[in-house]
C-alpha cells in the first residue's frame, strides 16, 4: 500500500529535508509540495492524500487556517 503524502511549508529547505527523509520509505509517495496554506487546500482537494506534513507557522494562511478550512468541508 502506498501512502500518498503532501508536504506543506513556506521554507524550501524544510520541504527538501522532509523529502530526503521520506525517500527512505518505499511505501511513501510525495504527490505534491506546497509553499502556503491556500496551495495546500487546493492540493488536498485534488490529490486526497493519506498524510499531510503541514507547517503551522506560515505567513498569511497558516497551518491552523488550513485545518479549519478542511474541517468545514
What are these regions (language model features)?
Residues 12-32:
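Two-component/phosphorelay signaling modules centered on CheY-like receiver
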Residues 33-51:
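Acidic, metal-coordinating helix/loop segments flanking the phosphotransfer/catalytic sites
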Residues 42, 64-73:
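Short amphipathic alpha-helix used as the core "switch/output" element in two-component signaling
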